[in-house]
């Protein structure tokens, strides 16, 4: 019975590490995709990124046992992805243009500026939804592979942060914040990974890191539950919308001249 319990505990600890990689990349990617109202298949992205997290966990835990195994593994994966980019360059180009235009529309709405949308000779028969989904999947799976290579035995939290933070921050440029679920999930994962970054050696420290990560993740989820009671999604969305309203008000005020300001002061004071 004790052996079975140990196996179960080991499975939970190892699986929690896979979930950290998966949820970290997926939530960061969805912060951009959902907040900018991109057209994509969310369920397919979730399924393939989760499958990729499991595959790369198995791959890199094996490659780590060989000299320069991770390096050769990353080179092989990069070459494979380059081949996919060449093979589906038409669909990917359409996906890039669609994603970029989604960002530009939100940016223009937020800043009140006029920017020309991207255009190109569309020879791709696939739908914009398929092309954007393909783009998100390739980006997500590649970052899952990259982060997995520096995560399980000797963790490099800087790789995770460098690969995911841009997707969380990008919507802010257009006055948007990732949707409630994705933004909160990313914060939980980021805090958990940063909190265990100093434990990098093998064996005992690795097991301690896994246990500490599980404790931190549980603590963050409890705090998130409390946060949910005080700031439910509806209130969160209202406050996010106020960012654009406040910014637009400031822009309007900056265009007032002295005469307009004096007229406004006389009217209200």
Located regions from the model:
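Helix-boundary/low-complexity linker signature
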Residues: 1-269
């Amino acid at each position: 019975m004790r052996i079975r319990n140990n196996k179960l505990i080991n499975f939970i600890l190892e699986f929690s590490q896979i979930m950290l990689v998966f949820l970290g990349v997926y939530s960061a990617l969805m912060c951009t995709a959902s907040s900018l109202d991109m057209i994509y298949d969310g369920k397919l992205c979730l399924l393939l990124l989760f499958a990729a997290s499991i595959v790369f966990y198995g791959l890199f835990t094996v490659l780590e046992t060989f000299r320069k195994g991770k390096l050769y593994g990353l080179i092989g994966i990069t070459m494979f992805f380059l081949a996919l980019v060449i093979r589906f360059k038409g669909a990917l180009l359409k996906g890039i243009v669609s994603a970029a235009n989604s960002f530009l529309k939100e940016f223009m709405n937020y800043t009140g500026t006029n920017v020309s949308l991207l255009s190109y000779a569309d020879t791709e028969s696939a739908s914009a939804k398929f092309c954007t989904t393909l783009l998100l999947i390739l980006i997500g799976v590649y970052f899952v592979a990259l982060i997995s290579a520096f995560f399980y035995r000797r963790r490099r939290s800087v790789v995770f942060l460098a690969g995911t933070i841009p997707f969380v921050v990008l919507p802010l440029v257009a006055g948007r914040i990732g949707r409630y679920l994705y933004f909160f999930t990313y914060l939980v994962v980021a805090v958990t990974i940063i909190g265990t970054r100093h434990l990098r050696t093998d064996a005992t420290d690795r097991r301690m890191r896994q246990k500490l990560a599980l404790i931190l993740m549980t603590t963050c989820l409890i705090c998130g539950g409390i946060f949910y009671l005080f700031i439910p999604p509806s209130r969160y969305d209202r406050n996010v919308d106020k960012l654009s309203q406040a910014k637009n008000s400031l822009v309007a005020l900056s265009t007032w001249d002295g005469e307009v300001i004096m007229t406004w002061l006389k009217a209200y004071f």
